[in-house]
């Protein structure tokens, strides 16, 4: 087994699939709850989400029903919340890294959770073009067999969020500004030029094959032992 694959097995990997925005086009709209169940974490009890008042307080500030910051459903937000709590409780060394930021909702949730656990010394690295998603390649085919390039043309406006807007959203959390690192540009150009030495939690949400592959090649080796890797759209694209 190649070294990268061996190391892969040593880490906790949270694989969540399905991105809501990818089913809003080309007549793919369907009942969200029934579609989500096919990809749900079988170990996740929804009652836990409702009963967890600390999570609900944070989710109310970033969740899709309360704001414009994220399209992630409550289950995925809770997975991220629990992952952040895990790395703090287990004293996993390293910073928080997100590739593919959109409006900053997931990063805001991470920041608020870190603050809840008095962990504001960790840096949060946010990689994005802040000008929209780069054009998909022929490898980017979704679970319905639809070339993502076709959907991308419809989504371009939705996916385009400026750096200034994300900075404003992140600032609203109260997390120390000096510990929020915004890295603007395509990840193929910015990584590994600007990267932390160690990563406690790596969240990948750039959707596309080429960018995700590049991120894993350069950032995965920096994930601390027993750290967390979240691939947001794992299973949604054939690549």
Q: Whereabouts are the PLM-identified features?
A:
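Conserved alpha-helix/loop element of class I SAM-dependent methyltransferases that forms part
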Residues: 78-92
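N-terminal auxiliary segments of SAM/dcSAM-dependent transferases
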Residues: 1-44
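S-adenosylmethionine/decaboxylated-SAM
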Residues: 5-15, 46-48, 53-74, 90-239
């Amino acid at each position: 087994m190649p070294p990268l694959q061996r190391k892969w097995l040593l880490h906790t990997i949270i694989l969540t699939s399905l991105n809501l925005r990818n089913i809003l086009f080309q007549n793919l709209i369907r009942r969200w709850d029934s579609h989500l169940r096919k990809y749900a974490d079988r170990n996740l009890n929804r009652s836990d989400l409702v009963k967890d008042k600390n999570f609900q307080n944070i989710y109310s500030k970033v969740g899709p029903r309360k704001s414009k910051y994220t399209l992630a459903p409550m289950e995925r937000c809770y997975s991220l919340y629990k992952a952040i709590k895990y790395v703090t409780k287990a004293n996993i060394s390293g910073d928080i890294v997100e590739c593919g930021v959109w409006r900053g909702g997931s990063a805001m949730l991470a920041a608020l959770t870190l603050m809840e656990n008095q962990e504001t010394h960790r840096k949060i690295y946010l990689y994005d073009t802040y000008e929209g998603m780069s054009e998909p390649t022929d490898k980017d085919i979704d679970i319905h067999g639809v070339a993502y390039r076709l959907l991308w043309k419809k989504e371009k406006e939705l996916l385009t969020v400026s750096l200034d807007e994300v900075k404003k959203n992140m600032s609203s959390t109260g997390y120390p500004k000096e510990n929020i690192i915004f890295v603007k540009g395509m990840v193929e150009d910015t990584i590994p030029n600007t990267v932390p030495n160690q990563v406690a939690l790596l969240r990948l949400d750039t959707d596309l094959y080429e960018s995700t592959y590049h991120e894993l090649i350069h950032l995965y080796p920096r994930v601390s032992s027993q750290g967390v890797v979240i691939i947001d759209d794992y299973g949604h694209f054939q690549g």
